[in-house]
Amino acid sequence: MKTALTIAGSDSSGGAGIQADIKTMTANGVFATCAVTALTAQNTTGVTDILESTPHFLAEQLDAVFTDIVPDAVKIGMVSSAELIAVIAEKLRQYGAERVVVDPVMVATSGAKLLRDDAIQALTSQLLPLATVLTPNIPEAEILSDLPITDAAGMEAAARTISQRYGCAVLCKGGHQINDADDLLWRDGGGKWFRGRRIPNPNTHGTGCTLSSAIAANLAKGYDLDQSVERAKAYISGALAAMLDLGKGSGPMNHMFDLKGGFAE
């Protein structure tokens, strides 16, 4: 059985973070392992507290996974400090990690920055050059490219700039504010659009975590990047269309809507 590692924060509501990652990877037919960067006290209405992992303990978790259940792919999500980012980059290099998907969690839904300037510097200088593919939303792509994005042409310019800067593929997610659910994959000097329709579901907590984890799971199974993105988009559309309705705020998706179906293949 193929394996995938998620390096991210824990979400006590179960809709995002490692909880969403593990459910997504399982539903997509791979065995999931994890290294926790932070514990969060949160629910569908917001975050009330965060307890960050120490660099030493994060390193211990990564050593434990890489020396035993070696991952076929790695997904990296919420990492809130420069020190933790440095640990992750060091361990990825030490163990020769392959098929690395980075979801650069930098901006909250409200638009507020989630990373200090030193953490952004560590992310861009140490972690992004190790990535196979980045999955920024529009605000994150604007930060990484230093370009404004107001339309599809802006997405293309930003994705091209990010790819050239960090030497990796970039999946720029347009659903945040530009269009229905059309995402642009920029790789090897060219772009490819993956069309999608917006699902009329207000419960979208954890969509970024879920998409990046589904991509990692499919890369782990041997699908190429284009196929992995296409399959991941189909999976997340199905999870949203299942219309799970939990909590008082922006609730989670139904990650297990098709547990015995084709996504595990």
Predicted regions and their residues:
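Conserved N-terminal subdomain of the carbohydrate kinase-like
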Residues: 3-6, 26-110
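Short pre-catalytic strand/loop immediately N-terminal to key active-site residues, enriched for Gly-Thr
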Residues: 7-13, 191-205
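N-terminal basic/disordered segments at the start of proteins
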Residues: 14-30
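Phosphate-handling active-site elements
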Residues: 29-33, 192, 218-232
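Charged C-terminal helix
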Residues: 49-52, 226-265
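Nucleotide and nucleotide-moiety/phosphate-recognizing core
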Residues: 86-95, 168, 182, 188-190, ...
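Conserved phosphate/ATP/ADP-binding segment of small-molecule kinases
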Residues: 117-191
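Short, small-residue alpha-helix embedded
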Residues: 142-143, 201-225
